Amino acid sequence: MGGCSSKSDPKDYIAHETRGPVPAEGGRHPHNGDSSRDRSDASRRRATNDPPAQERADRSNRRPNNNTVDFQEFKDKEKNVVETMLESNKGLRMAEINFNDLKLQKIIGAGAFGEVIKGTYCGTPVVVKRMLRNKITEDNLRMFGDEIQLMMNLRHPNIVQFIGASWNSYSNICFVTEFLERGDLFAVLRNPENHLTWAKPILRMTIDTSRGMAYLHSMKPPIIHRDLKSMNILVSSTWGAKVSDFGLSREKSVDETMSVTGTPLWLPPEMIRGERYTEKADVYSFGIVLAELDTRKIPYHDIKAKGARNKKVSGSTLMHMVAYENLRPSLSKNCMNSVRDLYKRCTSDDQSVRPTFEEIVQFLENDVRKETLVRANEEMNVIEDEQNNSDVSPEELGVHHATRYVD
């Protein structure tokens, strides 16, 4: 991939400085002390067969130190892993960008393998996901490479755009994606400054997410996200939504549809039970996101441990209840009927009952949109009735229109 400046060589690490012996206290040379004291010390050493201080220091330096790490050896090992896993991969080299074209500004998040940094690439705002130094292993680099190769082939308005990757320094193994101003949906829903309704802008974010997932499932073979949740849905300044974070995403295969991955609160029951799953696992996770959109709260926020007044249920207990007791997040009392119906179908224990994302998009654009408009009109009528029934006119309160309309 292109860059904004010429490609530069990797920066070498700065070697550790080797310091000489520390002078004696007060800056005096050891031989500049009192002569009688020196003779006394020499006599004491001869009596105890104790070697001079310098000889003891030499012996100490010759002893192996089990706590010492050979920095060059560590560096060479890292370099070998990176070159084996990344440099030799021609597909990844096509996505490489110059790290010098990136300007890192501030850390805005963290994950299991690295940190999320806001920055710019050639002056354009971007998100940089950089791998932590102590996470540079063959397995993690393989996952890193898999995610890059997957994102390189994804092109859709509701999928976060991949820009490039860089590993020209072993401390700067990272990949770059577009920056969305409002952050993730999890934060958006819990920000008290955001006055959200289904009419504006929840329905749009829901449809956008469904379209992005429908695109992933339309691939040949289908791509199963396996970690769909509100934290992996990013929101733009205009309330558009895009699916992100494909670290656990895989093309559908028999071998890989048996492994348990993802975040517990959004996991479908078949994955918890260790059963084979399909792309309908993502549909279940989307159903949990619907509950978040309805309540603006974390899933299962109201579930308490049995026999305890305010104690929360442990994660393992919660997962057991989801898998074997059909536990699902609760919805609000004001939840629209169409949303409640869609939620129940998405979170059904029977995978065949769950709709496809193409069907979800159609349902949202028709049934949910109609009910949203009806509810919005009802709310407007209530507001108008309250205003018409007011005993005090705006003029009496000193409020006057600045514009007069004439025929």
Q: What is each PLM-predicted segment?
A:
Residues 105-116:
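Protein kinase glycine-rich loop
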Residues 144-149:
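Regulatory alphaC helix of protein kinase catalytic domains
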Residues 161-173:
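Short beta-strand micro-motifs within the conserved protein kinase catalytic domain, predominantly
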Residues 170-184:
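Conserved short submotifs of the Hanks-type protein kinase catalytic core
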Residues 192-208:
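Activation segment of protein kinase catalytic domains, centered on the conserved DFG
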Residues 282:
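Conserved catalytic-loop aspartate of Hanks-type protein kinases
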